[in-house]
């Protein structure tokens, strides 16, 4: 896998369902110019770990926006699958309304560019990328299919980057930079 951290983020343009499940939009990297972007890939809709991550990030979306960061979820499912999942009753395995779009990487082009595509399965690993306002990848983490990511850690890392300084082990907001 080619290193992305410190390099311009690979361009993308994808169809997405709006977080409220009411309509579609196009999302592209250029839409986020001037803002931080936390883009996270997940394997499939209607699964077990994925909704815990998506709803976890959604519940804290305002904290990301307060940091001038936008959230974007991506999977290889179609935008229609995303729409159905958002609009399906939670008690029946639905996701419910969320606070950011979910994009469709149906062609797997984007997950391949970001180095997280599992070709033989047609899905992506759990990759998360923090892209700065100039479009540079500042952080990436990739998890196996079975382990979800941490919203707290993502916020901590985002805040650390926004200090503009060097942050030591276990740095937290309010700590001094090196």
Swiss-Prot record:
The keyword Transport does not apply. GO terms for molecular function: thioredoxin peroxidase activity. Its EC number is 1.11.1.-. GO terms for cellular component: cytosol. Residues 3-163 form the Thioredoxin domain. InterPro entries: AhpC/TSA, Peroxiredoxin, Peroxiredoxin_AhpC-typ, Thioredoxin-like_sf, Thioredoxin_domain. It catalyses: a hydroperoxide + [protein]-dithiol = [protein]-disulfide + an alcohol + H2O. CDD domains: PRX_Typ2cys. It is found in: Cytoplasm. The active site is a conserved redox-active cysteine residue, the peroxidatic cysteine (C(P)), which makes the nucleophilic attack on the peroxide substrate. The peroxide oxidizes the C(P)-SH to cysteine sulfenic acid (C(P)-SOH), which then reacts with another cysteine residue, the resolving cysteine (C(R)), to form a disulfide bridge. The disulfide is subsequently reduced by an appropriate electron donor to complete the catalytic cycle. In this typical 2-Cys peroxiredoxin, C(R) is provided by the other dimeric subunit to form an intersubunit disulfide. Homodimer; disulfide-linked, upon oxidation. PANTHER family: THIOREDOXIN PEROXIDASE, THIOREDOXIN-DEPENDENT PEROXIDE REDUCTASE, MITOCHONDRIAL. This is Putative peroxiredoxin in rubredoxin operon. It comes from Clostridium pasteurianum.
């Amino acid at each position: 896998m080619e290193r992305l951290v410190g390099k311009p983020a690979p361009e993308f343009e994808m169809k997405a369902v709006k977080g409220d499940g009411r309509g579609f939009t196009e999302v592209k990297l250029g839409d986020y110019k001037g803002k931080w972007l936390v883009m996270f890939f997940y394997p499939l809709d209607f699964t077990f770990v994925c909704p815990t991550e998506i709803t976890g990030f959604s519940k804290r979306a305002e904290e990301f926006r307060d940091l001038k960061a936008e959230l974007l979820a991506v999977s290889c499912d179609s935008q229609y699958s995303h729409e159905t999942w958002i609009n399906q009753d939670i008690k029946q395995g639905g996701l419910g309304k969320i606070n950011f779009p979910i994009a469709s990487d149906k062609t797997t082009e984007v997950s391949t560019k970001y180095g997280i595509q599992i070709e033989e399965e047609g899905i992506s690993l759990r990759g998360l990328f923090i892209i700065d306002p100039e479009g540079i990848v500042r952080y990436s983490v990739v998890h196996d299919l079975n382990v979800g990511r941490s919203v707290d850690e993502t916020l901590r890392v985002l805040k650390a980057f926004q200090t503009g300084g060097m942050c030591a082990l276990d740095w937290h907001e309010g700590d001094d930079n090196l």
